């Protein structure tokens, strides 16, 4: 819907004012959430990691404490795009909250990755094993997590 409206107006999908207008019209009760998420998606798409981090942290705090999917998505992005211990600790907090809300392969895998990046090999192993078990139970490919588990075991 938004993409269609932007295309009709000759925009390329980065007009935040046009996005807000469409959202206010069709989903007024979700305007703040969806506009903030849209801004994050623009930063992610343009790989503007300097501006992404503070906005992602604020977005997670304000909108995502009960949303396991968004929390895990942000935590995974922070894990992949940042190298600082402080950022990984914040991402781990999100990943663990996501696991608390809904324990599935992706959430366990993100937590395992973050524990590994933080050099907490004991918890990394626990969460990698949980990820593999959850993935296999759901019929999900777990090859990446199995590879991580081998790295964890080798690093111990």
Where are these regions (language model features)?
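Oxidative protein folding and maturation machinery
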Residues: 1-156
